[in-house]
Amino acid sequence: MAMPNLGDMMKQIQQAGEKMQDVQKQLEKIVAHGEAGGGMVKVSVSGKQKLLSLTIDPDIMDDAEMVQDLVLAAVNNALDESARLAQEEISKVTGGMMNPADILKNLNLGQ
């Protein structure tokens, strides 16, 4: 049984590191959107799972409980979309050689 070539292993590790840097750059470019209540609450989040914007229809501001529920729903919708887009981007960058869920966890972005 042949031993793995150390030079080849080091090259693969370097390539994986470069791909991770590419993934980080691509995640910064992703913007996902979510909404709830038929568009009464809209949010945008980055591919790094950061809230970028929140818009609330002023007509619903009198009902605090409804606003809270709609904000939570819209944020969760946007985060789900962001995770889906991030996994797609990771698959593109890595050519499917690395598990997108594992990469997201390594970047502290996975569930």
Curated annotation (Swiss-Prot):
<keyword id="KW-0238">DNA-binding</keyword>
<keyword id="KW-0963">Cytoplasm</keyword>
<comment type="similarity">
    <text>Belongs to the YbaB/EbfC family.</text>
</comment>
<dbReference type="Pfam" id="PF02575">
    <property type="entry name" value="YbaB_DNA_bd"/>
</dbReference>
<dbReference type="GO" id="GO:0003677">
    <property type="term" value="F:DNA binding"/>
</dbReference>
<comment type="function">
    <text>Binds to DNA and alters its conformation. May be involved in regulation of gene expression, nucleoid organization and DNA protection.</text>
</comment>
<dbReference type="InterPro" id="IPR004401">
    <property type="entry name" value="YbaB/EbfC"/>
</dbReference>
<comment type="subunit">
    <text>Homodimer.</text>
</comment>
<protein>
    <recommendedName>
        <fullName>Nucleoid-associated protein Ppha_1174</fullName>
    </recommendedName>
</protein>
<dbReference type="GO" id="GO:0043590">
    <property type="term" value="C:bacterial nucleoid"/>
</dbReference>
<dbReference type="InterPro" id="IPR036894">
    <property type="entry name" value="YbaB-like_sf"/>
</dbReference>
<dbReference type="GO" id="GO:0005829">
    <property type="term" value="C:cytosol"/>
</dbReference>
